[in-house]
Amino acid sequence: MAYAIIEASGKQLWVEPGRFYDLDRLDADLDQSLTLDKVLLVQDEGAPQIGQPYVAGATVQVTVLSHPRGRKVTVYKMKPKKKTRKKQGHRQDLTRVLVESITVGGKVLTANAADLPKSEADIDAAG
């Protein structure tokens, strides 16, 4: 099982080829292909390659699937014995990306054909 740990949107993510992930909103169009080069670790076969801080020559190729919004978070503040109440809601803008491949040292790591989703309906059903 090939995987990489990347830094994207200020967070570290464990990513595998053929799977999709929700990141904070990226400035990219739908079906646009992006290359993420902040790769902290790559594991394929044998010992993992650990970067200091990033693995040299390692990239992760992703495709933008959609720009959904996250679940609503409700923030409620009140002061007891006073008539002070404040209720706010927030929904985070997200970008759903599909990891196409991981490239390290000229070697391209992709998912098996059986692991890839067949259609957009399969992607929506999984997430």
Curated annotation (Swiss-Prot):
InterPro entries: bL21-like, bL21-like_sf, Ribosomal_bL21, Ribosomal_bL21_CS. This is Large ribosomal subunit protein bL21. GO terms for biological process: translation. It comes from the Bacteria. It comes from Synechococcus elongatus (strain ATCC 33912 / PCC 7942 / FACHB-805). This protein binds to 23S rRNA in the presence of protein L20. Keywords: Ribonucleoprotein, Ribosomal protein, RNA-binding, rRNA-binding. Pfam families: Ribosomal_L21p. PANTHER family: 50S RIBOSOMAL PROTEIN L21, LARGE RIBOSOMAL SUBUNIT PROTEIN BL21M. The gene is rplU. Belongs to the bacterial ribosomal protein bL21 family. Part of the 50S ribosomal subunit. Contacts protein L20. NCBIfam families: L21. HAMAP family: Ribosomal_bL21. GO terms for molecular function: rRNA binding; structural constituent of ribosome. GO terms for cellular component: cytoplasm; ribonucleoprotein complex; ribosome.
